[in-house]
Design a protein with these regions (language model features):
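N-terminal signal peptide c-region/cleavage motif recognized by signal peptidases
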Residues: 14-18
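Acidic, low-complexity Ser/Thr/Gly/Pro-rich repeat segments typical of extracellular/periplasmic
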Residues: 34, 51-120
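Bacterial N-terminal signal peptides that target proteins for export
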Residues: 1-8
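N-terminal non-catalytic regions of secreted/periplasmic and cell-surface proteins
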Residues: 20-58
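Generic anion/oxyanion-binding catalytic loop in active/binding sites
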Residues: 10, 31, 89
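Intrinsically disordered, low-complexity boundary segments flanking structured domains
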Residues: 10-12, 46, 76, 107
């Protein structure tokens, strides 16, 4: 009976630790809702170390002044930052004036994918 209790407690502690390991987006550059010039690199900073082989992002132009179009994927390189909690998205060319959305997927040691997005505008 004692072994069962110890095993149950150990499993409970392990599960609570894993549940806390979901990465959360802490900040981004440009920040959510920012208006500015075309960024050379977009930085996403997370609460947990990322598993780069399962994490990624897409950069999408969602609106261009004076033009109606569907969301348009933009060519960009996605890489890990120097910090394992950072993801870098580097557009392959300067972004034209418009609205953008970074659709990200982050996976940490718990292996559960977490998704989200960051929107910003280029003037």
């Amino acid at each position: 009976m004692r072994t069962i209790k110890i095993t149950a407690i150990t499993l409970g502690l392990l599960m609570s630790t894993l549940a806390q390991a979901h990465p959360k987006l802490l900040s981004s550059t440009p920040a959510e809702g920012a208006d500015g010039t075309s960024p050379n690199t977009i930085e996403l900073h997370f609460s947990e170390n990322l598993m780069t082989q399962f994490s990624g992002a897409k950069l999408v132009m969602t609106e261009m002044p004076g033009m109606a179009h569907s969301p348009m994927p933009m060519k960009a390189k996605v890489a890990a930052g120097s910090d394992p909690k950072t993801m870098l998205i580097t557009p392959l060319s300067p972004l034209p004036t418009g609205s953008y959305n970074v659709e990200w997927r982050a996976v940490s040691s718990d292996t559960h994918p977490i998704t989200g997005n960051v929107s910003f505008k280029v003037k």
